[in-house]
């Protein structure tokens, strides 16, 4: 037990120390003088890096770029059998699965209704999925940069930056070098990286077993750093070829949260308010720690169904309950979705924490860039409510918060919630949806709720007892992913454009609400809990909470 506490403290301490350092590195990347290679890329792509955009042009560029990324990935998956690097001769994906997968990776969700080792070729995994892992992560970073600039400038609607320049810099100077270095570490610790086809082996029982191989380490590196989460293998990081040792497990857990944590301090440096960044980071860090302790406690508790201590089903013995608990919380507070254990087999309360983390709109660390710009929506709402309470015009970092900013903030907060609840309600009423359940009762409801929470929250993890590879779920979850991603990005860019055309006051008035102290910390945490968590309390009571109490009557589903 002492060893586990030491490991947990090392993990949290490392996150606390390295997040501001990585944030400083990100800040310097976007201040860095344009290199010769970068100029060459701008020239061949016809990009003018000195031309700034307003929010409409920035949004249009982002949408067009992501659409063509989706379209290219869809074609790669659909026509997979005609493309190279397919030693297993896998056929192309059917249209609905190809559509779902292309949307999934283009929106940084990485929801997988298939097992990669038995469905996708090397080319599809590398040129298709891995490429989108880079681009979707950088897209989130671009939106955060635009919002940060909108807050930090005065009277300049064309000061949000250049989307194409931001995209190239984020990919070229941040994700590519970090992923390359991390992939080398992973290979050194035993993660597979090869173009060899599957190996046939004879087991101790005398049966033949097919052992799939592939370029795994290169995909794992970016899937974790980019908060993507989609695994090369169907069981994701539970597979020994993706995650062979406690060291690789620790490094991957750390890599899930480091860039989202760094984005908090990137935002603080661009807006000139590091103390405000620390206040936001403190809220995120608190929710992370509380989540880990709750999950660890309940997963280690007495299991009335099996009559043993601990909920061990679905967990790797080599990682244990603590590492499974840390990973579950880390992957759900971030929009990562990778797993080293099966969330469907967690205790009801352990599973509840994962669902709730996603339903908080992935703002506790969240995706690269996406978590921070999602958190700012809650920050703006907090500032507005505090201003109303004291009878002052709300201000945020020297800029007045008015009707347009609050409307867009509420839209960005409520749209994913509406999608989750509406699509879940539809699915429990449709026979095609219910036929995919392998579990009934409250756990069956939790599986459907988790699926749409994961889709709309752009997380990608699942309660895998739900057979999601059907036309109904492939299409419905794809729609949820699109609305959950761009239904937040567009309001954020509108806010960026609106704030950019306002004057930023450097003088803090006597009645202004401080966004740096303990009062702000408590209010922001309260708004997140009230607006974020209580929205889903009714449905959670008839899902995992009900299942928790039924479990003590020795009933399971």
Curated annotation (Swiss-Prot):
Molecular-function GO term, any one: potassium ion binding
InterPro entries in the record: KdpA
Record-level GO BP terms: potassium ion transmembrane transport
Membrane topology listed for this record: Multi-pass membrane protein
Presence of the UniProt keyword Transmembrane helix in the record: yes
Broad class of the protein's primary localization: membrane
Keyword check for Transmembrane: yes
Keywords of the record: Cell inner membrane, Cell membrane, Ion transport, Membrane, Potassium, Potassium transport, Transmembrane, Transmembrane helix, Transport
Pfam family, one: KdpA
Assembly with partners or alone: The system is composed of three essential subunits: KdpA, KdpB and KdpC.
Similarity comment: family membership: Belongs to the KdpA family.
UniProt xrefs under PANTHER family: POTASSIUM-TRANSPORTING ATPASE A CHAIN, POTASSIUM-TRANSPORTING ATPASE POTASSIUM-BINDING SUBUNIT
Function: Part of the high-affinity ATP-driven potassium transport (or Kdp) system, which catalyzes the hydrolysis of ATP coupled with the electrogenic transport of potassium into the cytoplasm. This subunit binds the periplasmic potassium ions and delivers the ions to the membrane domain of KdpB through an intramembrane tunnel.
Protein's UniProt name: Potassium-transporting ATPase potassium-binding subunit
Origin species: Leptospira interrogans serogroup Icterohaemorrhagiae serovar Lai (strain 56601)
Gene: kdpA
């Amino acid at each position: 037990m002492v060893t586990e506490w030491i490991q947990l403290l090392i993990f949290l301490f490392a996150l606390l120390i390295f997040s501001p350092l990585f944030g400083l590195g990100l800040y310097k990347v976007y201040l860095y003088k344009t290199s010769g290679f970068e100029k060459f890329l701008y020239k061949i792509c016809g990009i003018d890096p000195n031309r700034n955009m307003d929010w409409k042009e920035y949004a249009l560029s982002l949408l067009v770029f992501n659409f063509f990324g989706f379209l290219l990935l869809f074609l790669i998956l659909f026509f997979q059998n005609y493309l190279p690097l397919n030693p297993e001769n896998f056929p192309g994906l059917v249209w609905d699965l190809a559509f779902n997968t292309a949307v999934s990776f283009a929106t940084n969700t990485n929801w997988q209704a298939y097992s990669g080792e038995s469905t996708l070729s090397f080319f599809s995994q590398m040129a298709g999925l891995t490429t989108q892992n880079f681009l979707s992560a950088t897209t989130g970073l671009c939106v955060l940069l635009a919002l940060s600039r909108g807050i930090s400038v005065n009277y300049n609607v064309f000061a949000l930056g250049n989307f194409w320049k931001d995209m190239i810099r984020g990919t070229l100077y941040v994700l590519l070098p970090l992923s390359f270095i991390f992939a080398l570490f992973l290979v050194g610790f035993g993660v597979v990286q090869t173009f060899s086809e599957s190996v046939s082996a004879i087991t101790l029982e005398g049966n033949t077993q097919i052992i799939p191989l592939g370029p795994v380490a290169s995909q794992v590196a970016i899937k974790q750093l980019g908060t993507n989460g989609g695994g090369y293998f169907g069981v994701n990081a539970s597979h020994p070829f993706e995650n062979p040792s406690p060291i690789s497990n620790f490094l991957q857990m750390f890599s899930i949260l480091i860039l989202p944590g760094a984005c908090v301090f990137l935002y603080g440096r661009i807006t000139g308010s590091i103390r405000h960044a620390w206040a936001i980071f403190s809220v995120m860090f608190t929710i992370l720690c509380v989540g880990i302790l709750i999950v660890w406690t309940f997963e280690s508790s007495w299991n009335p169904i099996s009559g043993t201590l601990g909920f061990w089903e679905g967990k790797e013995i080599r990682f244990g309950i603590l590492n499974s608990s840390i990973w579950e919380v880390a992957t759900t507070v971030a929009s990562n979705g990778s797993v080293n254990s099966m969330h469907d087999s967690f205790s009801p309360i352990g599973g509840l924490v994962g669902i709730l983390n996603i339903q908080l709109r992935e703002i506790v660390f969240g995706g690269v860039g996406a978590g921070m710009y999602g958190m700012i929506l809650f920050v703006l709402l907090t500032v507005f409510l505090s201003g109303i309470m004291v009878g002052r015009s709300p201000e945020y970092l020297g800029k007045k918060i008015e009707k347009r900013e609050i409307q867009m903030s509420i839209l960005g907060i409520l749209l994913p919630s509406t999608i989750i609840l509406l699509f879940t309600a539809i699915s429990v009423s449709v026979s095609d949806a219910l036929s995919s359940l392998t579990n009934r009762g409250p756990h069956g409801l939790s599986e459907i709720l988790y699926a749409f929470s994961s889709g709309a929250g752009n997380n990608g993890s699942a309660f895998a007892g739900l057979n999601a590879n059907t036309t109904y779920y492939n299409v419905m979850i794809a729609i949820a992913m699109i609305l959950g991603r761009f239904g937040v990005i567009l309001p954020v860019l509108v806010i960026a454009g609106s704030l950019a055309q306002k004057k930023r006051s450097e003088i803090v008035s006597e009645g202004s609400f401080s966004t740096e102290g303990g009062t702000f910390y408590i209010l922001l945490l309260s708004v997140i809990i009230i607006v974020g968590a209580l929205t889903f309390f009714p449905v959670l009571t008839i899902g995992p909470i009900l299942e928790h109490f039924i479990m003590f009557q020795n009933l399971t589903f």
